[in-house]
Structures are given as structure tokens and as C-alpha cells.
Amino acid sequence: ERDATETIFHFVQDMNERSFLSPKEDIMSDYIRLDKRSFIVKPLVSESPIQEVNGINVPRIEKLLVDIQCDRDFFYLQGQESLYMMQNAFANYNVNIGMLLRYASRRNIKPQIEKYIKEFV
């Protein structure tokens, strides 16, 4: 929820975790490294696939896979790296294809996601 974004950011920061509040492209590419754990706190897109874990709503793998493909904030993960992440997700997690396609359609990248699914499934 948008109102809780800042509160969640400060909560994560208070746990001494690397956290970023709605970072822009330059911050993402300069300070967020794939080999270090970092938390990116952003408001959710409406109707985003989420799940409750320990009483907290968190994004599902389907949301992350779609957002990496279309969100400019994740441009540094696009291309070959995103293909690798998609392949790993299908190999290691129970990805709900219907949910993935529904959210991809909402974000206007359904054909691209369908192409990836054909490669990995």
C-alpha cells in the first residue's frame, strides 16, 4: 500500500539492511549489486500478485518476473540477465503461469512473457 511504503522502508533500514526507497535508474545501477542482499521498497501496482508471509504482504515471484522485464528501474537486469532469472525461477519455484500471464497482460508485455515461457517450460 502506498501509505505504508515509507514506514516499511524505515522498518527495513532499522534492521540494518541495505534498503532503497523507490530508487531511480542511476541509484539502481550505481548502488544495488546482485551479489549483496538489498531491499527495494516501492509502491505496488494495483492488482499486483502478492502473498501474505508472516502477516506481511510481499510480491509473488510472478510479479517480480514481469516487473524485471518492463520496469525501467530494473533496466540493468534486462537482457541476458533477465532470461537467466526467468529460467532459474521456472527451475526452482512453483510459478503460476496463469497469474504470470494475467499480470504481464496488465503491464502490456504478455507476448514477451509468452515467448519466454515457450523457451523454459
Regions found by a protein language model. Give the residues of each.
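Hydrophobic alpha-helical interaction segments
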Residues: 13-121
